């Protein structure tokens, strides 16, 4: 971006800053002091004469109304900068507009129409497997045919065979990025980030090392660089992403377990709409029929007259009927012996009602 700044030294010696050499504005283009009324400043701290700030290709003057790019100490307008340093299609070598969708294969970028097999000219769609050999795209069928011919023909180095056998998966088309502004101190920066594709052998080596130690030290990373052929930065980023994915996965599993436990608890408490304390059923045990407490002996109370009546009834049943008759004398009176027996028997019995005591019969 170009900014216009008022030059205070243009008004003459009105302060101490105009007398100091450090306060003088120096033009980056011609190297002389700027005495103009206005200074054109390019971010962050490059100052120019209005007549010196122009495109190095088309000599178009650059001001605050246009975009200015700086590369290798030269200034360019947007059109020439994109034409010279912008991203180009690896097939047709033409540039991209901001609305174009592109396909990527390693460091190469293609138009959707240019993303085709170089042998059969079949367009590669998202999800198709392809290979990149000598900057040429090959579909899966042509890649297999080429490998068969190569193995049957002249021998080649094992490393070359390994590099050509890896197949890639075509991804969805993405929007091409506009080139970023490059300043003098950021000349070596790339305008795009390229996704690194790993083959099965490299992934197996990295996963084996990760299972043994998720945080390898510098010595282990150097060994992985030699074993996989990847850069140290790619290996470091792969381990960081792997740890992050595993952490997210563990957090998700923990949340699912807690959710299942809470759902199970709620289903127990709210069975048929009732709430209460959860109980745990135990194993069955034998029922103990004993009664707690001290045993008390119960005795039956019988009145004396009831015992006498039972005794009399029992004696009547035991004796014959003729013995129950009272003997009479020939004179018609009771004998003395019988009267005395009755008297003596009544004296030994307890008090009973009068109806139970026999009386002498007068004749």
Swiss-Prot record:
Positions with biased composition (Low complexity): 329-340
InterPro entries with a match to the protein in the record: HD, Homeobox_CS, Homeodomain-like_sf, ISL1/2-like, ISL1/2-like_LIM1, Znf_LIM
Start and end residues of each stretch annotated as Disordered: 328-363
DNA-binding positions: 191-250
GO molecular function, one term: cis-regulatory region sequence-specific DNA binding
LIM zinc-binding domain location: 27-80, 89-143
Keywords in alphabetical order: Developmental protein, DNA-binding, Homeobox, LIM domain, Metal-binding, Nucleus, Repeat, Zinc
Keyword Repeat (UniProt): yes
One GO process term, biological-process aspect: positive regulation of transcription by RNA polymerase II
Gene Ontology cellular component terms for the protein in this record: nucleus
Domain of life: Eukaryota
SMART domains linked to this entry: HOX, LIM
Primary localization: nucleus
Keyword Zinc listed: yes
One Pfam family here: Homeodomain
Location(s), subcellular: Nucleus
UniProt biased composition (Polar residues): 341-363
PANTHER family found in the cross-reference section: INSULIN GENE ENHANCER PROTEIN, INSULIN GENE ENHANCER PROTEIN ISL-2
Function, in words: Binds to one of the cis-acting domain of the insulin gene enhancer. May be involved in subtype specialization of primary motoneurons.
The name this protein goes by in its record: Insulin gene enhancer protein ISL-3
Organism: Oncorhynchus tshawytscha
